[in-house]
Amino acid sequence: NHAAVLIWSCGNESYAGEDILAMSQFFHDHDPGRLVHYEGVFHCRAFDAISDMESRMYAKPWEIREYLESHPKKPFILCEYMHDMGNSLGGMESYVRLADEFDQYQGGFIWDYMDQALRHTDALGRSVLGYGGDFADRNTDYNFSGNGIVYADGAGKPAMQDVRYWYDTPARRAAHDARNAAAAARADRDAAKAQAARKPGTLTVTEGDGNLGVRGDGFEILFSAGEAGPS
């Protein structure tokens, strides 16, 4: 594999100054065909010339809109956004819609693509992906390194479905929505038929725990009740 350099970066989270300006000038002088990026100029406008684009981390959609509506000289790009840690990545639609409305909105880079984890053997002898706190470590960020849209072994997370959907074309998203609506309608009809055909009766759990599950298209909705019944 060979790296494909699209944009030169002057670093990350280092404010701005003469040294970073000199780096930007070096890139412009020796490789004028490529753009130069640096987010830090947002915090220090005296060195605004460092970056060829306006760049922010985790800017809110309305903040980006405010910038784009001000008739700026530079296009806007999010050098980091979404931060897919835990059950996150919600609200991507608000960012994608900006691309449909403003030519100067260049999208962003999800932080990040893949979890950082180490495979180890847990207390039950299973080989698992370990994060902070799984190695008898006391001072830890726990799963802070688990913020990718794929797991450390490359398997896709649920968030990947949302990314795939919103990064698709509007026409393909509409077709996807139509398929989902048709599938939901079929499921409703099937459930109504099953309910109508069901014989009256009672369900009794006499001992132990009770689990009721409904399996769908890649999902499982599970209800669990202990011996004392649902709370």
Predicted feature descriptions by range:
Residues N1-D188:
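Extended substrate-binding grooves/exosites of carbohydrate-active enzymes
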Residues N143, D153, K157, K199, ...:
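Low-complexity, intrinsically disordered regions enriched in charged/polar residues
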Residues R126, Y142-F144, A152, A197, ...:
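Compositionally biased, low-complexity repeat tracts
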Residues A175-G208, E220-I221:
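Mature N-terminal, pre-catalytic/accessory segment of carbohydrate-active enzymes
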Residues P72-K73, Q104, G208-D209, R215-G216:
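Short, well-ordered loop/turn elements at secondary-structure boundaries
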Residues N211-S231:
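Acidic-aromatic substrate-binding/catalytic surfaces of carbohydrate-active enzymes
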Residues I64-E66, V96, P200-L203, G210:
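Generic recognition of flexible, low-complexity loop/linker segments
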